[in-house]
Amino acid sequence: MQGKKILFISYDGMTDPLGQSQVIPYLSNLTKFGYSFVILSCDKPGSYAANRAYVENMLAPFAIQWVSIPYHKKPPVLSSLYDFYVLKKKAKQLHAIHHFDMVHTRPGLPSLIGIYLKNKFGIKFLNDIRGFWADERVEGEIWNLKNPLLKKIYHFFKAHEKACLAKADYSVCVTYKAKEIIHNRTDLPNQPLPVEVIPCSVDMNLFNPDKVDQLLKAAFSSALNINKDDFIITYLGSLGGWYLTDEMMHFCKAVADKIPKAKFLFIVPDSQSTVAAAAAKYGLADGQVIVQHGKRHEVPVLLSFSNYAVFFIKPCYSKQASSPTKHGEIMSMGIPVITNSG
């Protein structure tokens, strides 16, 4: 595939933290091997307006073109159907221009388009599994199966998951457990299917404690009222879903009761009020909780305040196929991680 053109379709925006931590670093490094990419993503209008220039600067040195369409959240289901229609139409237009050799998607709506492009145009299809997606939606309490429509959608995507595994030219996953689960499925023909494990990786040049911008750190220290003798425990990433917010806040309160100088830094896209409300349930004072959104280059600086980091994940079936990027990023900074068993 060296020297080939690849379409990467993402329902996550490049102007959101996930796109900047899990998509752009991977693809930018692959361009060094002669590949060129077009990223087709759905971006929240507010994030796009605020971060478009930042993302364009990230991509500028590489053979990567970025095409973004607006993400719609409401009304539920219908908004997703509309986004799918626009993504599919745009993917066809881009293929007419670039004549892609391969389409690379993660599960969900993008993989529907990946299968379509393979069937319609004979493009090779790379099925990139970052979690058992339909089950994640249920176990993350996004889809309630008591709702008949959502139950139908769940079963549709479970069938689609099977089709992706069966039809993909290759599948990749991030855990050996996921590969084992896939290869143990008796409802898939031609086992063992072509599956490779590529664990979540980290940019160790960026997440390097020896390369922290000390001027930026001093500015954050002043703005966030972080003192040298504070004991900082950090959470990185979005709250909710599969991450056990209540349990983490309970843990933070237990630490605060034992360590008076403890403060809890949340490097999150969530609002101050959202985090404060979750913390208040467990009696954490406003002065003990720090909330800061960080751009990609700012995250290592914010992490460098940490004595420890914490994240608790719901131990469920779907998460056997996922590997938190944050884990590698935190460890690359030399910060001990407190987490739960699964």
Model-derived regions, located:
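Carbohydrate-associated surface elements
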Residues: 177, 201
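Nucleotide-sugar-dependent
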Residues: 17, 243, 292-302, 307-331, ...
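A short helix/loop element that forms part of the nucleotide-sugar donor recognition site in Leloir-type
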Residues: 51-58, 208-225
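Conserved donor-binding/catalytic core segment of Leloir-type glycosyltransferases
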Residues: 7-9, 227-243, 249-252, 265
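N-terminal subdomain of nucleotide-sugar transferases
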Residues: 1-67, 98, 250-257
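Glycosyltransferase donor-sugar binding loop
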Residues: 43-46, 236, 263-276
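Membrane-proximal helix-turn-helix segments that form the acceptor-binding/catalytic region
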Residues: 85-93, 112, 116-120, 133-134, ...
